[in-house]
Amino acid sequence: MAKKTPSIDTKNLTAVQLMELDSCTRCGECVKWCPTYAASGQKPGLAPRDKILRWRQYMNKSYGLKAKLFGPTEIPQSELEEFKDDVHGCTTCGICATVCESGINTVELWESLRTNLVKKGIGPFGKQGMFPKLIGQYHNPYLLDQKDRLAWVPPDVKIADKANIVYFTGCTAGYKQLALAFATSRVLNKLGIEFTMLGEDEWCCGSALIRTGQVHVNDVAKELAKHNVEAIKAKGATKVLYACAGCFRASKVDWPRLLGEELPFEVVHITEFLEDLIKKDKIKWEKSLDKTVTYHDPCHLGRHVGVFEPPRYVLSHIPGVKFVEMDRVKEFQRCCGAGGGVKAGIPDLALSVAESRVKDALDTNADVLSSACPFCKRNLMDGRDSLKADIEVEDVIVLVAQALGLSVE
């Protein structure tokens, strides 16, 4: 009789992750905080605890004592497909890791499980499966011409050919949310900061591939990271500035892992850079905004990397800004709903989560809901529009530009 093959494997799960799967006590604390579980009407399969329990059951059926004695129990394909849907119905925001009393690094676990399933031909979710081929071919997720990477640059913005600082624009700011690129570049010019950009040599950071379990597919993610690092080195830069939280997280956390070495330059978010300049009294404001502003922590910037205070410091020092906090902030903030591929794969779920976050902002009576991530901004705008709410959604760097008397158009 032919030996049965287990329906799943554990090849890309680390020893620590295998122990983490066993360490879940099923206390349910994560269930209370999960944004997609709440937004879905409490669909059981989306609860972090449930996903861990099911994968543990799959492992027991495949590799437990009974499986070793009598062979693995086959897991129906339909069941694995349903599990795939639930694993991808997660923004990988990391709130479950924050509240987990067993200390499980759930973000890493969810991404590993996604990768595991994709390697078995199960997933990714919906149109996410096109990411490796298209990003590998076009070097950006929008399928636009790389030669247009700097098409947004207005005549008044000065860019050096080489400099110690590279502004890594990101695909979204460079192609879609141009106000973010206008604001960042003009603020740097206004402050006398010499910087350069990579232009058509700037490739996608790879975040979309990594977050959706496709980090391994054709080695595209590694190729992107390697190319970008070499392009930055060629500019002679020692520091790279990011206004996109997703690019920042990918560069700071994922690139070193993919390449197996530390980066030869410093990775800095624009709010960290501005905080330092404000503390050194190097910013001379020109305009009072006279607005009440609240701030949404992007998961990639906050929980994933730990940058919580710089955006708040910057906002609180802008003339005329009354800064107010929402109920859930910093480590315990509510995700905007766009991360982990959910915006692309399950847009209705992403919108529902965004509506909840916009309601948090409305409770503060703020004029402006700010963030430091173009993906958060886009989804929060969608949530606001869906609610027909009267609140401005804007990036922190755009508010800085306005207070310096600069145009973002």
UniProtKB/Swiss-Prot annotation:
Keywords: 4Fe-4S, Iron, Iron-sulfur, Metal-binding, Methanogenesis, Oxidoreductase, Repeat. PROSITE patterns: 4FE4S_FER_1, 4FE4S_FER_2. Its cofactor is [4Fe-4S] cluster. It catalyses: methanophenazine + coenzyme B + coenzyme M = dihydromethanophenazine + coenzyme M-coenzyme B heterodisulfide. Part of a complex that catalyzes the reversible reduction of CoM-S-S-CoB to the thiol-coenzymes H-S-CoM (coenzyme M) and H-S-CoB (coenzyme B). The dihydromethanophenazine:CoB--CoM heterodisulfide reductase is composed of two subunits; HdrD and HdrE. This is Dihydromethanophenazine:CoB--CoM heterodisulfide reductase subunit D.
